[in-house]
From Swiss-Prot:
Keratinocytes of epidermis and other stratified squamous epithelia. GO terms for biological process: keratinization; keratinocyte differentiation; peptide cross-linking; response to UV-B. It comes from Pongo pygmaeus (Bornean orangutan). Directly or indirectly cross-linked to cornifelin (CNFN). InterPro entries: Involucrin_CS, Involucrin_N, Involucrin_rpt, LRR_dom_sf. Pfam families: Involucrin, Involucrin_N. Belongs to the involucrin family. Residues 1-133, 150-206, 221-285, 321-342, 381-428, 446-486, 501-548, 566-809 are annotated as: Disordered. Residues 1-15, 776-789 have a biased composition (Polar residues). Its main location: cytoplasm. Substrate of transglutaminase. Specific glutamines or lysines are cross-linked to keratins, desmoplakin and to inter involucrin molecules. The gene is IVL. This is Involucrin.
Amino acid sequence: MSQQHTLPVTLSPALSQELLKTVPPPVNTQQEQMKQPTPLPPPCQKVPVELPVEVPSKQEEKHMTAVKGLPEQECEQQQQEPQEQELQQQHWEQHEEHQKAENPEQQLKQEKAQRDQQLNEQLEEEKKLLDQRLDQELVKRDEQLGMKKEQLLELPEQQEQHLKHLEQQEGQLELPEQQEGQLKHLEQQEGQLKHLEQQEGQLEVPEEQVGQLKYLEQQEGQLKHLDQQEGQLKHLDQQEGQLKHLDQQEGQLKHLDQQEGQLKHLDQQEGQLELPEQQEGQLKHLEQQEGQLKHLEHEEGQLEVPEEQVGQLKYLEQQEGQLKHLDQQEGQLELPEQQEGQLKHLEQQEGQLKHLEHQKGQLEVPEEQVGQLKYLEQQEGQLKHLDQQEGQLELPEQQEGQLKHLEQQEGQLKHLEHQEGQLEVPEEQVGQLKYLEQQEGQLKHLDQQEGQLKHLDQQEKQLELPEQQVGQLKHLEQQEGQLEVPEEQVGQLKYLEQQEGQLKHLDQQEGQLELPEQQEGQLKHLEQQEGQLKHLEHQEGQLEVPEEQVGQLKYLEQQEGQLKHLDQQEGQLKHLDQQEKQLELPEQQVGQLKHLEQQEGQLEHLEGQEGQLEHLEHQEGQLGLPEQQVWQLKQLEKQEGQPKNLEEEEGQLKHLVQQEGQLEQQEGQVEHLEEQVGQLKHLEEQEGQLKYLEQQQGQLEVPEQQVGQPKHLEQEEKQLELPEQQEGQLKHLEKQEAQLELPEQQVGQPKHLEQQEKQLEHPEQKDGQLKHLEQQEGQLKNLEQQKGQLEQPVFAPAPGQVQDIQPALPTKGEVLLPVEQQQQKQEVQWPPKHK
């Protein structure tokens, strides 16, 4: 090597160009490099030089000795060529090391592909040989059977019954007692024949004995034939042993099928847990199985019995399928399609958890219970994962059907999502639909958690859980004991039950929107899934885990313990986030508190307007509306329900008091009456809701024992509607602000309030409305009590408001059609329709 570097290198330009053309560029793969040997100039073509992966020193010495006899120019070319080869080799080694560092998985895949090709070729050759052997042996058997039939036809009539009996014995592979007696009788006859042959030599055979001798000769032929049959019976016994061996191999095949199910489960776990240590252990296990396959192939070549080989061929074909399945699984180690769906599902769950955390920050939930609930939810999810894994280890066949069913369900869900995207939902209903879909998902999740809590006690008795899980179960029992709702939350439960009625009302509205049929199908689909989960849990209690799977279960349990530890840490982080959110009131609550304060001021203002309403009732039907008052009506119509601008309204009211004797003042008061009509409509809507809530309160008697974790989860679930109501109130206030700032645009408001203005002249409906307002007064008191119990107050007017507003009802001669229509709609909507 040192001599080659010290020699001078002088090349003509033509030779250097030729050498540059002959030098191939570095190739990415080893196979292409081996296919392209370096061509040499014409004088040096006798010396074959190919680029191996590693060039040993002996070849270089031989190469140097072969070059000595050539002229100087040729030697210089040959000296230049090994230097170039060394440079190429160094470059190739660096490239190979870089490829090894970058692509270890590609090398493994290539090696496994080569192994699979070799195994497939060997298996095909062995199949051909076995087929040839089977054909030859079948031909031999056919020939033997033909010979047997010919021999059986040649036998005398006396032996026909005996031969039929022997054929039956061949089918049964057992020697009956009658045949054994006949064999003994024939052996005795053989002894007699030998004795008679001795006597033949000594005595002259008389004529009587000649017939006996012929008979004995016939019996000798029969004895030989019986000996042949005995050999055939022994051969049949051997075949019977081979059949037993085949039965044992069938048992092994069943065992391998079970192992296939376990391998599939392990591959799923490989996709789910991106842990390199698990993958290494599983790869070692796969290599062991490949070694077992080679051992079985070696045994296959040694077996001579055709029937055994047939079973082994089937076994090897199954193992080929296993190898292909394992290769597919190795390719799927990087996030398979199932993982992507699971990740999407987890992202959706994270969004729901964030939404729940935001709502928990708004509500006064005890801090201890928040962390416990999250911990329980995490543990319940882990228990579900354990149940699925156990069901997968014990029920591989059922899993295949369930996987097909789940794929069908995924297709149905995609189809439903596609249909949802095609339907045009109004903008106002879009937010409600999204919110209701989230609530439905949360309700289903909570129902699943309730079923899992009931099933926990059964699982404690049936499953042999490791020590980590035993401690976790004890911790769960302690948490269940701690999750008794305090007395302060009992009032919240009642309030949430009332909100449950509002949720049902929203469900009705959702049914009236454009997607009722899809949601019903989804609900039925989820109910079917719940039934399947219950069925799997029931099967899990009945099945006993085999001994081979115990080790796998322990391994999985260790992994689950690690996952639980990570989930606990995540739960602690989420708990800290919740505490931070609880320390600061969210912006929505601040706006709601201001809104409620403004509403309280508005109620006091309404009580002050009671006297004015009494005076206006007499003057409404008598006075016509001049043009100036029409403009004031339109201007004041847009000021109804504006709690932020109460000071402006007070100034307007003072102006109206000064103009009591004038028509303009009366028109302004009429407009104010229209404002109160809108408030009455709002109160009527609340009244319908309160009636429905009172019915539900009578129906839902919450026992003290059940006021546990499920009720607490229902609280969170039912309080999900509050932010949406608050958003609606904020939008309403923003609209009112915009209306106050733009009085010129108020002229073009809808004519609905003008119609109400004309319809206020009919007092015939006063009596029903008075009763309705009296009922409403009691419901408003109940709302005030609930407002004191919760930090999120409810719209609660003063108790004397309704009685004060009663004189402000319309006079005779007018009809309140919109109010009646709204009442009829509310009566139709409550109670909810059960489809």
